[in-house]
């Protein structure tokens, strides 16, 4: 019941207020990250007073907590620019920052250009599939359907291929607007790697990388940009880091895994994907997209994200302190943001890599 003297907003007004609230949440997340993290792109190497880093927007919400906790514990300031994985790799390669952050491992060409850089897994999360379909709260999607949408071959939400895997759901005859990252992005890498494992056509025609030539849709910069676009656009779909989905209140699709189950990007399912890692290669490159069917509850677009750091760095001591904090005490900040703790085998590999810097 409304309080005396108050009137209820009409339904259309309520929807407008709700949408504005979601957009405000996304903006506030961006502002919060910016106020703690953002530095000028191309900033000079950090002085002895602290560290600078740049890269992944996926890890940015967790990074904000790491930075705050590390500064309180050690008194060492850290600045971070959430500029995307591709830009982060470029900046650490140019040595304009002390560390890069990327959800995609270095390619052989990038590793060579970075000159003695080491990639260290330091966080574990997922790329979710956010959607804005009026009246639809729960949605199942398969890799084949997602490939069809981003190929531009599935264009309506009531397409039979979508309806078949969503029995009982009333799907509207609404045009689908696929949204993709316009900047170099680890989320793009993870999403397109999953599609490449599912669809031979996608693998041969598009492939996977931090930037690819999407066949359909509209581009948006950063996780905040793609989230905002999906929230504002009826019929839109986009691949978005799980923590941004939480902040925006967007619906997340349950995605089909190799066992044929449709799973959400929650902690339990991310951990199930990561549990398939039994060993870590020397270069620390780990892929957990579309894991084996034995991981029956795994979310299939889960990913590790990496710190990219050079050997014998000017700030070696501070870097080792910060990296060790991130992979140990810093993991406690993750659960509220849909970051799962590193599995023991990965944690061990990360500690070993840090010790060799």
Q: Would you name each region that the model predicts?
A:
Residues 18-32:
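N-terminal export and membrane-targeting signals
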Residues 30-40:
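Bacterial N-terminal signal peptides
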């Amino acid at each position: 019941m409304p309080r005396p003297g108050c009137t209820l907003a009409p339904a259309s007004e309520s929807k407008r207020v709700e949408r504005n609230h979601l957009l405000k949440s996304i903006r506030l997340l961006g502002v919060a990250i910016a106020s703690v993290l953002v530095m000028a792109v191309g900033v000079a190497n950090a002085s002895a007073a602290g560290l600078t880093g740049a890269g992944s927007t996926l890890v940015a919400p967790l990074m904000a907590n790491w930075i705050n906790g590390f500064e309180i514990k050690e008194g060492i300031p850290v600045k971070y620019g959430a500029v995307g994985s591709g830009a982060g790799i470029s900046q650490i390669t140019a040595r304009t920052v002390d560390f890069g952050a990327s959800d995609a491992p270095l390619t052989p060409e990038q590793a060579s250009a970075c000159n003695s850089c080491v990639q260290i897994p330091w966080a574990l999360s997922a790329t979710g599939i956010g959607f804005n379909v009026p009246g639809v709260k729960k949605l199942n999607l398969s890799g084949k359907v997602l490939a069809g949408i981003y190929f531009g071959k599935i264009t309506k939400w009531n397409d039979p291929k979508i309806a078949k895997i969503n029995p009982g759901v009333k799907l509207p005859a609404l045009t689908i607007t696929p949204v993709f990252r316009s900047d170099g992005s680890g989320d793009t890498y993870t999403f397109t790697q999953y599609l490449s494992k599912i669809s031979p056509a996608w693998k041969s025609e598009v492939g996977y990388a931090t930037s690819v030539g999407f066949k359909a849709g509209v581009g948006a910069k950063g996780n905040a940009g793609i989230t905002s676009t999906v929230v504002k656009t009826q019929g839109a779909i986009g691949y978005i880091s799980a923590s941004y989905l939480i902040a925006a209140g967007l619906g997340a699709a349950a995605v089909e895994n190799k066992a044929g189950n449709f799973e959400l990007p929650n902690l339990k399912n991310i951990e199930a994907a990561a549990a398939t890692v039994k060993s870590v290669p020397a270069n620390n490159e780990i892929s957990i997209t579309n894991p084996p069917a034995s991981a029956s509850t795994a979310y299939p677009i889960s990913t590790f994200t990496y710190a990219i750091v050079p050997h014998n760095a000017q700030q070696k001591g501070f870097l080792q302190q910060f990296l060790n904090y991130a992979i140990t005490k810093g993991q406690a900040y993750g659960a509220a943001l849909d970051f799962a703790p590193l599995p023991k085998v990965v944690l061990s590999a990360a500690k070993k890599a840090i010790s060799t810097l």
